[in-house]
Amino acid sequence: MSLTMKNVEGFVIFLVIFTSTAAVPQLQKALDGREYLIETELKYNWHQAWHECARHDQQLVTIESADKNNAIIDLVKRVVGKSHNLWLGGNDEYSSSRDYGRPFFWSPTGQAFSFAYWSENNPDNYKHQEHCVHIWDTKPLYQWNDNDCNVKMGYICEPNHFRETYDQALKQKCEAIKITNSKISTEFDQLHAKQSLEFDSITQNVAKVNEDWKIEIQKLQNATQIAIQQIMENHEKKIRDLSDNLLKQLQDSNEQLKQSTDHMNASFGEKLKGQQAENNEIC
């Protein structure tokens, strides 16, 4: 079966896309919980490797402890299967010395090496041209070597030191803000609860004063009504007593008048009767 030119072109495009996709290094999680990006293709000098890491918003790896070194060795074993030429982030600042003890520095941080995993008789600065640090494929123990910075190798990247430091500082600030906000919220809730209790107490006191006031007003009204009733009764009694006394006086006066009239009539009748008798005798 023959292939048309269109089929061939499609296959080539697919192969290019597949190859490009497959060549992109992926983040790998190590035993220390951190993620590293490992490029195994031997086509980058040290500076190119640095730039590649930067393009992924990362940096060439720094190894400051045996624990971190062991985690990276374990990761390389799992990803590559054996020791491999991989650029690290260290260099000797292009020192001309061939002293094995010459200082090396981690470029991402500027810090001098506090830990190293050199292979035997290294770093030797062979021909005064070896200034950059890498894991050496000729050493099965994944030991380090100094080499010409222009040699093509793979590389190992890790999260950017400054961004990681910034993120950590930002995280700490955020945590501090959360704690402060939580404290303020707690204090506000406590103050609000206290004010609510005080308000409830004041409300209860006002209600009690109002109730007591109503009771006192009612007592005063009752006392006033009783006093008025007593006054009215006293006035009525005085009026009755005065009326009774006046009536008795009138009755006594009438009786005296009657008696006086009767006496006068009787006396006048006797006189008239005597006069009549006298008249009868004379006439």
Swiss-Prot record:
A Pfam short name: Lectin_C
Q: Looking at the keywords, is Plastid present?
A: no
Tell me the leader sequence span.
1-23
Q: Which SMART domains match?
A: CLECT
Q: Sorted alphabetically, which InterPro entries does this protein's record hold?
A: C-type_lectin-like, C-type_lectin-like/link_sf, C-type_lectin/snaclec_domain, C-type_lectin_CS, CTDL_fold
A molecular function (GO) held by this record is: carbohydrate binding
Q: Does the keyword Transport apply?
A: no
**Residue ranges the record marks as coiled coil:** none
Note the PROSITE patterns from the entry.
C_TYPE_LECTIN_1 (PS00615), C_TYPE_LECTIN_2 (PS50041)
Disulphide-bridged cysteine pairs: C53-C157, C132-C149
Induction (record text): By injury of the body wall.
The protein depicted here goes by the name Lectin subunit alpha
